[in-house]
Regions:
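Hydrophobic faces of well-ordered beta-strands that scaffold small-molecule active sites
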Residues: 5-9, 33-35, 61-65, 108-112, ...
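Catalytic beta/alpha-barrel core
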Residues: 35-40, 119-120, 138-149
């Protein structure tokens, strides 16, 4: 078994004239960029800038999807599940994937952000909805999850959805 360690970082978390983080300095140091897709942060121009930067440094692009919570930076859990959550995730992946493809690259994986990530770890139904969204995307994407004592259930769901997981 080969273990492949990739350093990832949350990127593109500003919007409009407001910047957060030093994406220009960090991008050359990482293997994978979790780019905000407009839910907790990010806007079309910020996403494009990050995609161009990632492409120039041969950094993998990940969709950093979240609850629609810019005011709380995606850290507030929301009662969104089922079809509404799947649609929300498709919407955010679609925004980033469209910008990536317009710039000659693509999204390789999905990493939920903040409260959505933590709810996913605690609620198998939300995990299943996220996996459904990622698996039903038109391109093969991997899903980033945290290694937890519940790994067997997570792995079982991933197999059922035909997904590859990243830890």
């Amino acid at each position: 078994m080969t273990t492949n360690l990739k350093l990832n970082c949350d990127m593109g978390e500003g919007f409009g004239p407001w910047n957060m983080g030093d994406d220009d300095s960090i991008m050359p140091l990482i293997d994978a960029a979790n780019i905000a897709c407009g839910g907790h942060a990010g806007d079309p121009s910020t996403m494009r800038n990050c995609v161009e930067l990632a492409k120039s440094h041969k950094t993998e692009i990940g969709a950093h999807v979240s609850y629609p919570d810019k005011q709380g930076f995606g850290r507030r859990a929301m009662d969104i599940n089922g079809r509404a959550l799947i649609d929300l995730i498709h919407y955010q992946i679609g925004a980033l994937d469209g910008i990536a493809r317009a710039n000659g690259t693509r999204v390789a994986y999905v990493k939920p952000h903040g409260a959505l990530y933590h709810v996913m770890l605690a609620d198998v139904g939300v995990l299943n909805d996220i996996m459904t969204a990622v698996a039903s995307w038109h391109a093969e994407l991997e899903l980033v999850v945290l290694a937890t004592p519940r790994d067997r259930k997570t792995l079982q769901l991933a197999v059922e959805h035909g997904l590859t997981l990243r830890y």
